[in-house]
Regions:
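Extended, hydrophobic alpha-helical segments in both membrane/secreted and soluble proteins
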Residues: 11, 24, 30, 40, ...
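Active-site nucleophile and cofactor-binding loops and adjacent substrate-binding regions
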Residues: 2-5, 29-34, 53-63, 196, ...
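An N-terminal assembly and electron-transfer interface module characteristic of large anaerobic redox
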Residues: 56-57, 74-433
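Conserved helix-loop functional segments at active or binding sites
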Residues: 13-21, 50
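Adenine-nucleotide phosphate-binding core of ATP-dependent small-molecule kinases
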Residues: 1-13
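Oxyanion-binding/catalytic loops of NTP- or PPi-dependent enzymes
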Residues: 38-43, 52-53, 110
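Glycine-rich phosphate-binding loops at beta-strand->alpha-helix junctions
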Residues: 6, 19-45, 58-59, 173-175, ...
């Protein structure tokens, strides 16, 4: 019964995203093989409060629909579909393999037919088909964002870092704030060691310390990233808790981070045994990025006490970090404008692939940006266009999460441009999702 309920709730609340299932009406015709299950059918009726009408052909109504469309669109041309005789004579063999083109390692199904014909499925981009990835150079701002936020920065050599090495995990809020922290620590004389791009192996490194299976996958990955830093022999790891992001939309209700981003550094400290070793200095201070003034004051209080760094140095480093964080936002907006101009000049279409900052992680987005560009469609991020539009306020939701305030602005922009559509990525469907 619980499984049947979860199937319906997931479909109505997470996929269709209904506010109230009872809005469907009093009588609903259902289709699809899933509704052959009486428990699922009854769960639908209980949750929606309607009378569900299940035709005898519910499981094949989609096939009937496709046949009717084909009939309507028939133009009198001979079909390329094989004849019954050719189908009976058809011989093929199927094998499975893993694509080695990128970290997604897609599971490919290779069907080999007579006449040296081959059909491959399961791939998320051209690489699985043996083709050149993004041959037409379709803009993909997920690639640019990863370059600008992470690969753009080159750490100091150890010999040039008088205060040593600090490890920073490539997780959660770091997909938004890493430019600040890299600049801040570099200006203070630290060499910044960033954990690698997420992968299944990184996840498995930290699997023993994950306290709950109900956490979102991006949070679970954090355990592997911190464990990786520990195994590199680092003696200093910094992973702050950020309850408040910077004020990006002044007239929004607030600018919180989600509860996971707010405090996950604390969760890591309490669940990874190696961090109980006095040999590792692990810092996870609660810090607000609300404004440069508030942030700087907190950093001075913390680093002067914990690391013995003079206030003047901390203030100077914080200012440089703040400027760099602003520069990244400006660069993203500039790149967004360039892609919009490209779409205008070429007549192509664009998808705003909107989500949280960590959705630029290929392990978390599962290669969806590459899949979209393989169809000749440009990919933009929500933060590349959010500054180009405003939201009519008050909103019908309580607008108090900073990332979502950005999503609303991006969605408002998309609604006004016919050459754009928006797809929202979410890894858990929590909170305002």
């Amino acid at each position: 019964a619980g499984l049947a309920y979860s199937v319906i709730k997931n479909a109505l609340l997470k996929v269709i995203k209904l506010t109230d299932p009872k809005d469907l009406g009093k009588q609903v015709v259902v289709q699809g093989g899933t509704f052959y299950n009486d428990a699922v059918l009854r769960s639908f009726e209980r949750i929606s409060g309607c009378e569900a009408i299940r035709p005898d052909i519910a499981g094949i109504m989609g096939a009937f629909g496709a046949a009717l469309i084909a009939k309507d669109r028939y133009t009198g041309q001979k079909s390329t579909m094989l004849s019954f005789k050719e189908i009976n004579e058809l011989r093929f063999k199927t094998s499975m393999t893993r694509c080695q083109g990128c970290i997604n390692h897609c599971l490919l199904t290779v069907n080999e037919f007579t006449g040296d014909r081959k059909f491959i499925s399961g791939n998320r981009c051209e690489k699985g088909l043996g083709l050149e990835k993004n041959k037409e150079q379709i803009p993909n701002l997920f690639e640019y964002k990863n370059e600008r936020v992470f690969r753009h920065y080159k750490p100091l050599k150890k010999a040039d870092a008088p205060r040593g090495v600090v490890g920073i995990p490539r997780v959660l809020n770091m997909y938004e704030n890493y430019p600040f922290w890299f600049t801040f620590f570099t200006k203070l004389g630290y060499s910044v060691k960033l954990s690698p791009v997420s992968s299944r192996k990184i996840y498995e490194l930290g699997i023993e310390s994950i306290p709950s299976e109900s956490e979102c996958y991006p949070a679970k990955l954090a355990h592997g990233h911190v464990t990786w830093l520990i195994r590199q022999g680092l003696e200093y790891i910094f992973y702050p808790c950020i309850p408040y992001e910077r004020v990006e939309v002044p007239d929004a209700g607030n600018h919180y981070n989600c509860p996971i981003v707010t405090s996950y550094g604390e969760n890591i400290k309490n669940n990874i045994e190696e961090l109980r070793d006095d040999k590792i200095k692990y810092q996870n201070p609660f810090i607000s990025l609300e404004s440069e003034e508030i942030l700087t004051k907190r950093l001075v209080d913390f680093f002067r006490k914990e690391n013995g760094i003079p206030a003047a140095e901390i203030k100077a480093a914080a200012h440089e970090g703040w400027l760099e964080m602003q520069a990244v936002r400006e660069d993203m907006t500039k790149k967004g404008k360039e892609v919009l101009q490209y779409l205008k000049e070429t007549g192509r279409h664009g998808i705003v692939l909107a989500g949280r900052p960590y959705h630029s992680d290929p392990e978390i987005n599962h290669g969806i940006p590459d899949l979209i560009t393989s169809y000749g469609v440009a990919v933009l991020t929500e933060d590349s266009i959010s500054e180009l539009s405003e939201v009519d306020r008050p909103t019908i939701v309580m607008d108090q999460w900073m990332y979502h305030s950005r999503l609303y602005k991006a969605a408002s922009f998309v609604a006004k441009n016919d050459n754009l559509d928006l797809i929202q990525l979410n890894s858990f469907g929590c909170g305002l999702d």
